[in-house]
């Protein structure tokens, strides 16, 4: 068996196109232009790349894009004041603070300062609590992308056995809640779970988000299972360079899985696309409009 490759690049492009069509509709019919504000603190090169990508894709979708760059030594009070200003700005419907923040800043306090209605990263305790309670909420973008990718393979996840390897607040925990909302039967595991290979081998859906390069091996996977690899790890090559790999040993797992996401080109492609989805949904909710079709 050779696994079907779940091409995140193509799926994300289609999702962005759907968002753009909905944005055009709400702008034309309702006079609403969704707006996303991204706050970047410091000059971390990787963060700058992510922010540029978000800016480009936000504008391409027809949304308003607002960038706010602050120095690494910015005072906590100044950062919180900016967030308060964005909370009150009617042209801003989504607020994202690029993480990680420089040392000395209280990340939890910053996230908690964002208006939950504009929390398009889905990290505010209000949204996390609503998600855990099975209520409508803005969900973190990467787990949302995982669900969308899974549903390109399976029209319904209802009744399927799923395992989430990883328990972070950013991916693992919210992904479990989203899967429960899809009526999947979910096991949450982590690097210290006992007999992890046996747990994983029972799953129809495997989500690897533990941050360990190529940890999930071929003999962990039930034949025909769908494998969603959230990991992004850089490892050295014999030539003295580095390459990106996921948490799944891709080449060997692809021989037994029914479908699998590559790294790169899988889940990572979906994160910004789902950020656009959340921004559109937030804009409609704030304006008292029906939930968009995407």
Curated annotation (Swiss-Prot):
Keywords: Amino-acid biosynthesis, Histidine biosynthesis, Hydrolase, Methionine biosynthesis, Multifunctional enzyme, NADP, One-carbon metabolism, Oxidoreductase, Purine biosynthesis. It catalyses: (6R)-5,10-methylene-5,6,7,8-tetrahydrofolate + NADP(+) = (6R)-5,10-methenyltetrahydrofolate + NADPH; (6R)-5,10-methenyltetrahydrofolate + H2O = (6R)-10-formyltetrahydrofolate + H(+). PROSITE patterns: THF_DHG_CYH_1. One of its GO terms (biological process) is L-histidine biosynthetic process. One of its GO terms (molecular function) is methylenetetrahydrofolate dehydrogenase (NADP+) activity. Pathway: One-carbon metabolism; tetrahydrofolate interconversion. Its EC number is 1.5.1.5, 3.5.4.9. One of its GO terms (cellular component) is cytosol. Disulfide bonds: none annotated. Belongs to the tetrahydrofolate dehydrogenase/cyclohydrolase family. Catalyzes the oxidation of 5,10-methylenetetrahydrofolate to 5,10-methenyltetrahydrofolate and then the hydrolysis of 5,10-methenyltetrahydrofolate to 10-formyltetrahydrofolate. This is Bifunctional protein FolD. It comes from Bradyrhizobium sp. (strain ORS 278).
């Amino acid at each position: 068996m050779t696994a079907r490759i779940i091409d995140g690049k193509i799926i994300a492009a289609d999702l962005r196109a759907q968002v753009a069509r909905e944005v055009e509709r709400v702008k034309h019919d309702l006079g609403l232009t969704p707006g996303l504000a991204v706050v970047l603190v410091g000059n971390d090169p990787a963060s700058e790349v992510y922010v540029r990508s978000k800016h480009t894709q936000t504008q391409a979708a027809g949304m308003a894009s607002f960038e706010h760059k602050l120095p690494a030594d910015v005072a906590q009070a100044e950062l919180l004041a900016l967030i308060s200003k964005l909370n009150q700005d009617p042209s801003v419907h989504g607020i994202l603070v690029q993480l990680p923040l420089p040392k000395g800043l209280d990340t939890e306090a910053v996230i908690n300062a964002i208006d939950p209605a504009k929390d398009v990263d889905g990290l505010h305790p209000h949204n996390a609590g609503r998600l855990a309670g099975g209520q409508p909420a803005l969900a973190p973008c990467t787990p949302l992308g995982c669900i969308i990718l899974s549903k390109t393979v399976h029209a319904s996840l209802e009744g399927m056995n799923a395992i989430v390897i990883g328990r972070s607040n950013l991916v693992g925990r919210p992904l479990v809640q989203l899967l429960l909302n899809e009526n999947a039967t979910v096991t949450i595991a982590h690097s210290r779970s006992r007999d992890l290979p046996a747990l994983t081998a029972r799953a129809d859906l495997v989500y690897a988000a533990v941050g360990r390069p190529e940890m999930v091996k071929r003999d962990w996977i039930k034949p025909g299972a769908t494998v969603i690899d959230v990991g992004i790890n850089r490892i050295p090559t014999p030539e003295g360079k580095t390459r990106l790999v996921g948490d799944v040993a891709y080449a060997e797992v692809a021989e037994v899985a029914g479908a699998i996401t590559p790294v790169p080109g899988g889940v990572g492609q979906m994160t910004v696309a789902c950020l656009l989805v959340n921004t559109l949904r937030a804009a409609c909710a704030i304006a008292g409009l029906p939930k968009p079709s995407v």
